[in-house]
C-alpha cells in the first residue's frame, strides 16, 4: 500500500536536502505517492504569499508533510512560513530525539533523550511589530505606564505569550510520550529569570 505524503522542497538548499531524503525513503522500499507543493520566496510573484492556500489544503488532506528549509521574504509583511504552518495546524509539540551512535566521535556517551518543546507560544507565536509601527508606540506607552523599563524609540517588538493552558498541554504531551515510549523520567527546563 502506498502512502500519500506532501513534499514541500522549499528553497535554498531545501530541494537538495529533500531529494536526498527521497532517495533514503525509496531505499527502505516503502511506497510513497509524493505530492510536491512549492512554498517560500519562489512562489511570491505567482501567489502573493509564501504559503499559498492550496499547499495548506494539500497538507490538510494527507495529514502528512515533509518540508525542506523555506525562506520567508524579509520586509514583505508575511510571517515565517514555519510559524504559519505551526499555527494553522496547531503543531504545538516539537519532538526531537537525541541518541548517541557508535563511532560518532562525541565526548558524550550513551545519550538517549527526547526533547519536547512547545512550538506555538513564546517567540514562536510570531507576534511581531516592525520599528516605526503604531503598535510599537502603543506598547511603549503601556510599558512606560506600568513602571517597567522602557525601550528605545527605534525598536522592533516581538511578544512572547506563555499561557497556562498551552503550558499544561505540552507538559501533558511530554508525560504521555514518556509513558507510551517506556521512558521513566521527565525533566522540565525553562528560563525563569527571563519571565519574572
PLM region spans:
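N-terminal phosphate-binding or glycine-rich loops at protein starts, especially the Walker A/P-loop
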Residues: 2-38
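Flexible, glycine/charged-enriched surface loops at secondary-structure junctions
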Residues: 32-36, 180-189
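N-terminal beta-loop-helix "entrance" segment that forms/cooperates
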Residues: 32-52
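Buried hydrophobic positions in well-ordered alpha/beta secondary-structure cores of metabolic enzymes
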Residues: 11-14, 63, 116, 174
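Short glycine-rich or small-residue beta-strand-to-loop segments that form or flank ligand, phosphate
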Residues: 4-10, 65-69, 186-192
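N-terminal glycine-rich phosphate/adenylate-binding segment common to multiple enzyme folds
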Residues: 45-145, 155-160
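Glycine-rich phosphate/diphosphate-binding loops that line cofactor/substrate pockets in enzymes
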Residues: 1-2, 59-61, 150, 171, ...
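Conserved small/polar residues in nucleotide/adenosyl-binding loops
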Residues: 194-196
Amino acid at each position: 500500500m502506498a502512502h500519500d505524503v506532501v513534499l514541500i522542497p522549499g528553497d535554498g538548499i531545501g530541494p537538495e536536502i529533500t531529494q536526498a531524503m527521497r532517495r533514503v525513503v525509496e531505499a527502505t522500499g516503502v511506497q510513497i505517492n509524493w505530492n510536491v507543493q512549492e512554498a517560500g520566496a519562489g512562489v511570491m510573484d505567482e501567489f502573493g504569499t509564501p504559503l499559498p492556500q492550496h499547499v495548506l489544503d494539500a497538507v490538510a488532506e494527507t495529514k502528512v508533510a515533509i518540508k525542506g528549509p523555506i525562506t520567508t521574504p524579509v520586509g514583505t509583511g508575511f510571517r515565517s512560513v514555519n510559524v504559519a504552518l505551526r499555527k494553522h495546524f496547531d503543531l504545538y509539540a516539537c519532538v526531537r530525539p537525541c541518541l548517541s551512535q557508535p563511532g560518532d566521535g562525541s565526548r558524550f556517551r550513551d545519550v538517549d533523550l527526547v526533547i519536547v518543546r512547545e512550538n506555538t507560544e513564546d517567540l514562536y507565536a510570531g507576534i511581531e511589530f516592525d520599528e516605526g509601527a503604531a503598535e510599537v508606540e502603543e506598547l511603549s506607552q503601556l510599558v512606560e505606564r506600568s513602571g517597567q523599563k522602557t525601550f528605545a524609540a527605534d525598536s522592533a517588538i516581538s511578544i512572547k505569550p506563555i499561557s497556562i493552558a498551552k503550558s499544561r498541554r505540552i507538559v501533558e504531551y511530554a508525560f504521555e510520550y514518556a509513558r507510551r515510549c517506556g521512558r521513566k523520567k521527565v525533566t522540565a527546563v525553562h528560563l525563569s529569570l527571563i519571565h519574572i
